[in-house]
Amino acid sequence: MEKQTRLSDLPDELLLKILSALPMFKVTLATRLISRRWKGPWKLVPDVTFDDDDIPFKSFETFMSFVYGSFLSNDAQILDRLHLKLNQKYSASDINFWVQVAVNRSVRELRIDLFGKTLELPCCLCSCITLKELTLHDLCIKVVPAWFRLPSLKTLHLLSVKFSSDGFVASILRICPVLERLVVDGTKGNVMITNIDVPTLRNLSIRNSKGKGTYVEGSKGFVIKAPSLTDLNFEDTLSNFLMFEPMPEVIKADIQVICDQSKNFIGSLTSIQHLSLCSLTSKTPYPACTVFSSLKYLELCTCSARWANLFACILNAAPELRSLKLKSKHKFNYNDPMTLWEEPAVVAKCLSEHLEIFEWRQYEGTEQERNVAGYILANATCLKMATFSTRCRNRNHRMLKKLKSMDRVSKACRLVFD
């Protein structure tokens, strides 16, 4: 009979992987960790999560003792990541102490979840030159001291963070002098205009679509000024105001908005190469003279009844476009039929000289859609492949026959039904 291997008999390297993958502080696991065999590997664990979820109140003191005892190890190694997931209420001094010990262990990533409670920013972070990534989740920030700095922070995640006023968002961004990546998921509190002004920012991701939009007096939304930005991901179904300052370095953007504005929307992305756009705006969201001379790939969402007119405008503004994808990315249910497609009087330069790939997902074969498809096939002289994805599985269906019968100016174009 083979001898069974006990967990405590495993080599330190394997124990480190196991410890790093587990929430550390369930009482049963804590009891094992304080045994002599586990003390050595625990001090070497590079990824630690303090999670007090499901800790009974009577075991709270045991939990606190374990956390303090673990942190007070004198010979602990470098800590790559610390996650404080704290459902109970802790004093600012407790949190500051835990973060201080992590700073002493050269922590690189820090995440704090407080389940709606207020966080007093740990002052010890001001001296931490190793911290590169900070995530704040489900908490409230009421004070950002003028002297506070995060000197080496490259990535900041603000997830369901509640601020007391507009100025606090700008304040927390100002304390990050070398910030390159910002993620904002949900805006809470009394903030009306979220002002993102970060000269060093390279990557920005904003998701403001949780809950239902409600009427507010005045403007509510975002002002973005990030001249060094190269990658933008922006989803906002709640705001009524958007303003993008010039961002000449952006090469890739995924934008989904319902805000009905013009001229201050995607017109700032003049160097864009890859654009994915969903907009319910009834106006062209950039100045009439705008040219997207570097745009090679366009994905346009067809969930709005007005998408076809926006589509025609962008074709004229993107003379170098080589790949075009039409797709309904959302499950919105609009009662309005597709706005009447008006064929442009002049064929867009991208169709006559450059477009090679055309793809249409969720193609329904309505009269308006057929007119759009026919226009592209009849004018895209360089087209190599046109793919139509439909719910129809019958290759002899009338809808597919109509597509096959359409004139194709490009003899090299291959028609594909997916």
UniProtKB/Swiss-Prot annotation:
Q: Where does the F-box domain lie? A: 4-60
Occurrences of domain FBD (ranges): 340-390
- Hey, what's the signal peptide range on this chain? none
Q: Which InterPro entries does UniProt cross-reference here? A: F-box-like_dom_sf, F-box_AtFBL13-like, F-box_dom, FBD, FBL13/AtMIF1-like, LRR_dom_sf, LRR_FXL15/At3g58940/PEG3-like
Mind telling me which PROSITE patterns this protein's record contains?
Answer: FBOX
Name the source's superkingdom: Eukaryota
Q: Where do transmembrane segments lie in this chain?
A: none
Q: What is this protein called in UniProt?
A: Putative FBD-associated F-box protein At5g56560
Which organism encodes this protein?
Arabidopsis thaliana (Mouse-ear cress)
Mind giving the lineage of the organism this protein is from? Eukaryota, Viridiplantae, Streptophyta, Embryophyta, Tracheophyta
